[in-house]
C-alpha cells in the first residue's frame, strides 16, 4: 500500500477477496482473518491512496449462511463501496472441507440472496461512477470498445474501463479522456490529449 501511494507508475487498484462479511462464515471458510482485519486494511489503503479502487470476490450461500451472516456481507459492500465484484453462488466442491458440511441454505434462497447482492453492487457502482462525470483520466488504450466497436477502450489507473471516440493508432498509447457519462461498469468520455 505504501509503495503504491508513493509510486506514480503503479495502478491505484486492489483486488482483495473478502468472500463474505460474517466472521462466523469466514471462520468456517478457514480464511484466517476477520471482517475487522479486512476493514483495517481497506481504511489504511483509503487513507494513503484517496482515489483507490477496490474489487473483491463474494460467495453467497456458503453452508450454514444465515440471513444475519448475509446482512453482514451487504453491510460490508456499503462500507467499502467496491468498484465491482466477482460474485458467485456457493457450489459444493468434492475434496473441500465445505463439501462435507450440512447445507441448509436452499437453492432458491441462495439465488434470492445473490440477486440482492447484485442489485446492491449495481446501485453502489452507479453512484460511484456518476461521481466521475466531468473528471479527466489518463487511460491506457487496449483496443476497440467492448460495448460499442466504433469506440476505443482503455483503463484508468483504478482499472476502470473507459470508452471514447478513438482511432486504431491509439492502441497501446496513453490518452487523457474527460468523462462525459457513465453506464453500469463503464465510463464514456472524449479525448482531451495524447502523450
Kindly label every feature range from the protein language model:
Residues 100-195:
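Terminal RNA-binding accessory module
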